[in-house]
Amino acid sequence: EEYKIPALTSVPVRSLSEFFLGAEPIWYDIFTNKIHKTNHLQKTKNESFKPKHVLIIGAPLTGKSTLLKQLAVESKELGSVLYINEITPEKARLLFREIKNSQENVYVFIDNAVDSSEAIQTLTNLPNIKIIAAERDFIYDTVSYRFSSQQFNILDVSGLNDFDIQSVIDSIPQGINKQNDSFSHDEGDMNIEPSFLEVMTHVIKDNSLADRFVDALKEFKKRAAPEHDLLLLSCYLYSCRIPISVDIAAAYLRSYDYDAIKAFKMLSSMDTFLYPYEGQLSDDNQAYYVPRSRTVSEIVMRKTYHKDMAKMLETFHQEVSPTRISRYDIFKRYAYDAKLMGRAFPDWEQGLSFYEEAFTRDRTHSLKQQGALYLANKKKYELAFIWIDEAKSITGNNNPTIRNTYAVILFNANYDKPNSPDVLLTLEESMDILQRCYNDDYRKIYHARIFAEQAIKFKVKYPDISKRKGYLELSMKWLESELKNRPNDKWMNRLTRTIRRNLK
């Protein structure tokens, strides 16, 4: 029952404007039938009739969750329909038994597919089930081996065609101020279909949800430090795909002498920005909350003053035990991201101290890997090598993502040094490692992109040797192969054009 699509009479009502300003779609938005159904909906529906399961991918704010909900509603006429935002392996095994015993055809729609990948593998063993799942493209790229081509058809839904663009613009509610009534391809990359986010950014004049969050943080900082800290923490946790609980809030606000009751009242009072959360990551003993959009949370993290970010991160990881975090296994995949820490800790010594402290709680290769990337980004290559070597010692030499990171650090550490036989050998070694990663691993796009970026730089430093080695030609071959399945991938399209220019 918990995974069935709710009835219209039971869902919260809100203005559709919230959706167009950046909030995540809710069932009421879908039931109004006022959100344009793009051509990707029909394509995904057609794929769902084929033997394989379907995984739709795309950049943030490209309409994946909206499409998934729209298709779930339309599929009710085909059989039993379930919609899942997250599901634990244990719940998946229970669901497996229920579906197996029912013997009816069941369509299961799963958002945030990577977080539920173990559960998905359990459910795919049933012959009477069809899974249609969604995930962000860059997250899928790093774990694509979990969704094999034997089981899944992959659909990229990032781009909008001309008809969809104008239909989306025409469906924007009257209450939202527009600065444009159309979108020209001149506004974006003319060779790539624009995304929903690009169209909205060009057309809508009103403050986005992200701007409202940032403005609220500034106001809270002036007059109410606890509210500022709690809202920023909520954004951090949701960017890590975890809700904030009263338990976490009370532990975090210990220095303000807040107990659970005070923390609950504060979370409840911020209903303009935080929604009550009742999903799989919650329990019945306390209240949970999430910001109105994960993408908005990530934008807020990028726009927040770095000292505020650093203070929040250090306080959270000192005061909040991992045992208080529901699905810590999901949280830790995103919690120590090198780019995020690079913004929070511009001083590398402070950042190193943060990672060293974090490793006392989370002794995994992935944390060491992120620490190595952070240090490499700060050009502390000797320390970065120590950290990535320690990651390799934890996993052995068989983890392609660790080998990929080692190759990247090796290349960047030596690239700016004066040309010499030793420098050349290290750059060639890096390229060789990436070639082996590409050949040995299912995550082809992940390795092809890094190889292409390095091939372009290699040609600048050693043009004659680059030509003899054929790095650019090999990059072009790999990228063109991947673009057949991802024609609107902006990163790969830009890399392909750059390589083409370098080959002339």
Labelled PLM ranges:
Residues 340-345, 377-379, 411-421, 452-463:
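Short coil/turn linking the two alpha-helices of tandem helical-hairpin repeats
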Residues 241-394, 400-404, 408:
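C-terminal leucine-rich, beta-strand-based interaction scaffolds used for sensing/assembly
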